Amino acid sequence: MATYCDDLGPSSAPPGQAQATAHPPGYEPGDLGAVGGGPLLWVNAPALSPKSYASGPGPAPPYAAPSYGAPGPLLGAPGGLAGADLAWLSLSGQQELLRLVRPPYSYSALIAMAIQSAPLRKLTLSQIYQYVAGNFPFYKRSKAGWQNSIRHNLSLNDCFKKVPRDEDDPGKGNYWTLDPNCEKMFDNGNFRRKRKRRAEASAAVRSGARSVGGAEAPALEPPSAACLDLQASPSPSAPEAATCFSGFASAMSALAGGLGTFPGGLAGDFSFGRRPPTVATHAPQTLNPSPGFAPGHQTAAAGFRLSHLLYSREGTEV
């Protein structure tokens, strides 16, 4: 059969099949016999699946299927990918996003919003829970974690005040209200903890100073007129600067004498133009310096509090 086809040549075949009888690239004539049916059978079967070629010896050659170039089943209709995206967006709308995304508010801000939404500006703990879970679906999933945070913020934040129930008001649990001084601190979802007042902080500092010193420290003298003129004038004269510094030195000497924390003789060294003494005159002789440290390091370390405060650099103006 193969010899008959070769003798006839291309004239015996129809014009449409002349080019189709060419062997596919990568195949020898011996391989065509393994198909079963000769070359005419291969020519008359254009839709032959590539499975028969893969069963032959050698690696599978590059084979172009007859349907090459046609839209495959995986591509789908035009715009199929966009349709899938739209379907996904339709399932997750605004309400679905609220359930998945945590609101950008702190727990203190949530409590403040709940209290401000009440007609009487006061709510119980359970009512605050209901407001948070009703307006923010994200908190409906796990209630244990954020409810504990709500309780901690109510007890630790000074801006939330506990109000007891009236006698004619049935129910259990106290009310929580917002301090009027803290209403201005709530802005755009940010709610900061209330800081201590300056008067309370200064009173705490004064009480701590009394407990450390054993007695009330003498108050510093008010600045004299020469000091005020010194601040106003750009280039003060030498006598005015000396008067201002002598007043400051006398106030520091009085403070050192009242507290009794400075070594003897150190308070008298605050005169103008004198440096504090070295550690060699005040340090105990029983202390042994550690190896590798010279006495000069101890002198610099001990005189840091006052010498570096008053004489930070040689030639610095006071």
Swiss-Prot record:
GO molecular function: DNA-binding transcription factor activity, RNA polymerase II-specific; RNA polymerase II cis-regulatory region sequence-specific DNA binding
Alphabetized UniProt keyword annotations: Activator, DNA-binding, Nucleus, Transcription, Transcription regulation
Residues in the DNA-binding region annotation: 102-196
Pfam family, one: Forkhead
TM helices/strands, residue ranges: none
GO CC annotation terms, alphabetical: chromatin; nucleus
Entry-linked Gene3D superfamilies: Winged helix-like DNA-binding domain superfamily/Winged helix DNA-binding domain (1.10.10.10)
Residue span of region Disordered: 1-30
InterPro entries, A to Z: Fork_head_dom, FOX_domain-containing, TF_fork_head_CS_1, TF_fork_head_CS_2, WH-like_DNA-bd_sf, WH_DNA-bd_sf
Residues in the signal sequence: none
Function: Possible transcriptional activator.
Protein name: Forkhead box protein I2
